[in-house]
């Protein structure tokens, strides 16, 4: 991570940290690094956004910056992040830009870039943009007169993306009753249209954005209302998306949450059965549940773990030519179809498995036994010392011996805060909590803020 770019683009409180001035510079410098210096006089750039009230302000500034470098900008309007990634690739654009802070509160916003291949930027590309941001007045081209180009609206891009998604499944969803939660974000109109077009009987919540209510007690980070609605309407299942549509969480017919691990298992199992799973491998992060790995083992499916963050999952998938990966939080990447986590794509693939197998979501998810998990955050003076602390290693070894293979420990420094995260999975809730507390107590005693 650099001074401006985090793990998922540039983010901050809109108009305070992520200002229109910064958005202009990101458009100008990002457009130069990623498009103009390839030799294109008028590189094509696609720009999309979510439903946040600050989106229009940042969009205007960003587009001004892009046009100032000579870019030909096509404004997509409200669309999902994976929609921008797909269209950038499909339409042969040099660059795609999404204005969104994903599952964050409405006050935040962000800007993330996609290269012409539909993938997020490399560290090297981000560093090149950051170097320009830190210069006072970098000498860059400034077209004048007839060399300045108009921007255009391409709102039908969303429909093009939905038509593509529809083509990835071989069945319709007639007879399935599905509740959709759009998080009052990018998928608020996309999801009902897509599932309706596939002949599902749909109910919706969180699909009435007003610019201020994105992710507010709805969507994939707040699936409680969805669970209630599924049970109340006697629906087959529910799907909750996040603000920019790159992640998904499901709810079964009984109102039970089905997370990213379970969704990956269900889809991966079907792909494996149909000999469509590259190298019989699913890529996940270290936060995936132990039950996920045990279930995969029983199916003869291999797994590969990365650091937390969908960008690391994608990097590993590209390295090994794997076509399914994701996170427990609901970022699921299906590389045969798109280059980033895609909630709508994952949702219709999951619905397709349910329709084709004739099994309920609870039956499919029940094949993976989730181990109870306890997570404790400990505030420390130097979070990176945890990896070499002898006392912490000692208590971890002791707990592992006691669990005798029926559990898992993960102790890691937080990526964003001065914390050590202690996560334990065990056979029972009581064991998970007890073991996590034992380890957290040692971390606190040896590394806490008062040390």
From Swiss-Prot:
PROSITE patterns: PGM_PMM. Coiled coil: none annotated. Binds 1 Mg(2+) ion per subunit. It comes from the Bacteria. One of its GO terms (molecular function) is phosphoglucosamine mutase activity. Its EC number is 5.4.2.10. It catalyses: alpha-D-glucosamine 1-phosphate = D-glucosamine 6-phosphate. Mg(2+) binds at residues 102, 242, 244, 246. Activated by phosphorylation. GO terms for cellular component: cytosol. Gene3D superfamilies: Alpha-D-Glucose-1,6-Bisphosphate, subunit A, domain 3 (3.40.120.10), Alpha-D-phosphohexomutase, C-terminal domain (3.30.310.50). Transmembrane segments: none annotated. The keyword S-adenosyl-L-methionine does not apply. Keywords: Isomerase, Magnesium, Metal-binding, Phosphoprotein. The active site is at residue 102. This is Phosphoglucosamine mutase. The gene is glmM.
